[in-house]
Amino acid sequence: MSYAGRRIGKAALSLCVTTALTVGVGCGVASATSFDAAAQPIDLGQTQVGMTIEQSQYIARQLKPVPLKVTLKKGPRRPIPEWAKSSIKPNPFFDNDAWRYVRKGYKPGQVMRQRKARWVKGYFPIAARGVQYAYVSYDSRGYPMTATATLVIPHHLKPNASVMEYNQFINSSGPNCSVTTQMNQLFSWGMMTSTIQMVGAALALGYPVLLPDGDGANNIYAINRVASHVILDSMRMVHEQHDFPLAKSHFVSLGASHGGMMTGYTAAEQPYYAPDLTAYVNQFVVNEGAPDLIKLAHSFGLYGELQNAPSVYGSFLMSFVVGAAREYPDLLPHLYQLFTPYGKAVVKGNRSICTPLTFAVGPGV
């Protein structure tokens, strides 16, 4: 298996290990039914709280190698399970209707709609202008999806100036957690602090800044092949948009924590998903990696009763479970049936909120 394949397989394995955190009794996939299941869904085996490495390896052996090049499709993707959907209705700007545009001939990175970034000067006083774009991208299986990004422009913009593409951490599943949403409201729940510092420095030096919403329109946390497509297509979007003279701009991609995961996957995916950008991406910089989710899940399993062994990182794991269920509903069609009442309550509380509120929910996991 390729390096990218191993990494994505590892993420899928982490989901399966994480599933054990909220189950009550053993339950195999074969014991349940679902009309929306894949032909061969993942069998989680006899899941339990103290899941062993051998049990997780049983799951891992079912995972197929990930193809390096995604085959792009035209039809809509599978719907998200009701239990994994956010209780907050997103703004129509984020409607996941890219497949309609693809059928009209739209290409990856092509702009579907745009709007002004309402509070760009509130967050970045040094900025001259900010525009938010919704554009065509593709999910991890090649289905069309809507992606969004904010382009912040400095004063005295030079034609084809190099662009800093910054991947903000999100760590949550709510629809109001994206940078694009945060920059259209006054209060950002602390999401924008590091972004303000990084972006302000780049703008002061005269560089435009690109801020994609790496989790996509469905707020899919930690499924980083999705994020890599969002990011690469945001670069294509910068070349395609007509508001600013950036058709030949080069990029430096930077991210920390969750943003670091997104940046690393983008570096691995770029030669296969967006070879046309090879000459335009100067560097990928992973400032800080995220914790190993598999080791994290196993360490939780050692405690047995997880309600009595709180960890702030439990919020990450719950966001990951929700994100994976949104991206791969057919591969894990019976996941919700394995949750205890406590696990269901944690998911319900986590699926619509942003960092740092997820930390308030997470310690009980």
Q: What are the roles of these predicted feature ranges?
A:
Residues 194-197, 221-243:
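Alpha/beta-hydrolase active-site loop
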Residues 33-158:
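Catalytic-loop region of hydrolases
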Residues 3-16:
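Bacterial N-terminal signal peptides that target proteins for export
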Residues 13, 21-32:
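C-terminal segment of classical bacterial N-terminal signal peptides
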Residues 148-151, 159-172, 176-181:
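Short beta-strand element of the alpha/beta-hydrolase
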Residues 42-98, 290-365:
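Accessory cap/linker subdomain of secreted extracellular hydrolases
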Residues 180-209:
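Short amphipathic alpha-helix adjacent to the substrate-entry channel of hydrolases
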Residues 236-307:
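Primarily recognizes the serine-hydrolase "nucleophile elbow" in alpha/beta-hydrolase
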